[in-house]
Regions:
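Outer-membrane beta-barrel translocator domains and adjoining extracellular loop/strand segments
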Residues: 71, 333-339, 362-366
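Hydrophobic, lipid-facing positions within transmembrane beta-strands of outer-membrane proteins
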Residues: 274, 301-307, 344-350, 374
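Transmembrane beta-strand segments that form the barrel wall of outer-membrane beta-barrel proteins
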Residues: 286-296, 307, 318-337, 374-381
Length: 381
């Protein structure tokens, strides 16, 4: 594959070629594990050309083309894809059309400093999709529980003979279903956070441990990033098998939303309330494992065994205590100057791992943000 433009990297699109050449590794020898020869398929070649054209158009080369040259020698065929990207298109005028006034007052997308798409930038589908994701993430971290990037789309306008594209980003209003009327997007505040257990009536973890692992906060807006951090924090706890987080909208919690800055949000800025239910399933706190093994050192046979006790929730804070007893025996034969024919070894190792940074004078906020572990270990041989 090659390009007729020196500035274009044709190798970056090699993944779009549907039929790959047979590997030449061990080609001089008969290799039973090599792949079968690839039979040239004209349909696959034509589809490859279409995929390559579409990939270049997505990068802003709207008039791109592909040529396919084939040469045959006996039963072998060489196919060469030649890319003709042409002149790339750039973004011209960029406008943001936000139908929801509350969202416009929060994001201020009419101000250039709050826009990632700028006139003169190379047009690409990836850049447009990244802007959709960016805006969606900002809103989903600011209380918009039911928002997603599908509420955002682009319209484009081109002028014949010019290589710039006028873009308009449209952010539509909320529709609960296809037949439902359009409304402003609901904004949610978390009312209560409840901790539930599958295993018993209560969770065998201290409440402060649960609170430190929960990035979501009561009285704060719903946040998708805080939700993911909460999942990650619980996954770090050795005492926890799995976590499932569900949200329930509070009935009759629809209130008139205040239109204003999100930084100065008060109780009336949110027109919906959510209850967050965190379901925690814990592992068995204690386990015992036994591992035998055989040894062979320079022809001297022996045996070893280890017995390990593990407690994953020592102080009801997901602290992990591990104590390992190990013994080994080996019969020594034919070693000159060695009197004792038997070699024995005993060892004990203990570890205590805290799922937090253990140090004095740490604030609660720091403890909740950090993800470090602290480990104490002692051994005897």
């Amino acid at each position: 594959m090659e390009s007729d433009s020196d500035d274009y990297d044709a190798g970056a699109l090699k993944q779009y070629v549907r039929q790959k050449e047979k590997p030449k590794l061990f080609s001089l020898f008969k290799n039973p594990f090599s792949r079968k020869p690839v039979i040239y398929d004209t349909l696959q070649a034509r589809l490859t050309c279409q995929d390559l054209v579409k990939a270049m158009q997505n990068q802003g080369f709207m008039h791109a083309g592909v040529s396919l040259n084939t040469t045959t020698e006996g039963k072998k065929l060489d196919a060469k894809y030649i890319l003709h990207p042409g002149i790339p298109y750039v973004m011209g005028k960029v406008e943001y059309d936000v139908e929801d006034e509350n969202i416009q007052n929060i994001l201020h997308l009419d101000e250039p400093d709050n826009q990632n798409l700028k006139p003169g930038m190379r047009f690409s589908v990836e850049a447009l999709d990244n802007e959709r994701k960016r805006i969606a993430n900002l809103l989903m971290d600011d209380g918009y529980f039911r928002f997603n990037k599908d509420f955002i789309y682009f319209s484009a306008d081109t002028i014949a003979g010019q290589n710039d594209i006028a873009l308009t980003l449209h952010l539509t209003k909320y529709k609960a279903s296809s037949n439902a009327p359009e409304t402003d997007h609901p904004r949610y505040q978390i009312r209560n956070i409840n901790y539930l257990s599958n295993d018993s009536d209560r969770i065998h973890l201290r409440r402060q441990v649960l609170l430190n692992a929960t990035a979501l906060k009561e009285g704060r807006p719903y946040s998708a990033s805080a939700l993911q951090r909460t999942y990650n924090n619980f996954a770090r706890l050795q005492a926890v098998k799995y976590t499932n987080i569900r949200f329930a909208e509070v009935p009759d919690s629809n209130r008139i939303a205040y239109v204003g800055e999100s930084q100065n949000a008060g109780d009336d800025d949110f027109n919906r309330l959510l209850d967050c239910n965190i379901q925690v399933s814990t592992n068995k706190p204690s386990t015992i494992s036994f591992q035998p093994e055989g040894t062979n050192t320079a022809g001297d046979f022996g045996a070893a065994a280890s017995l390990t006790y593990t407690n994953r929730n020592l102080f009801r804070g997901s602290e992990q205590l591990s104590i390992e007893f190990r013994g080994a025996y080996e019969a020594i034969t034919g070693l000159e100057g060695y009197q004792d024919q038997n070699y024995t070894e005993y060892s004990v190792e203990g570890k205590l791992v805290f799922p937090r940074f253990v140090a004095p004078f740490l604030s609660k906020n720091f403890r909740r943000r950090q993800t470090a572990n602290s480990e104490l270990s002692v051994s005897w041989d």
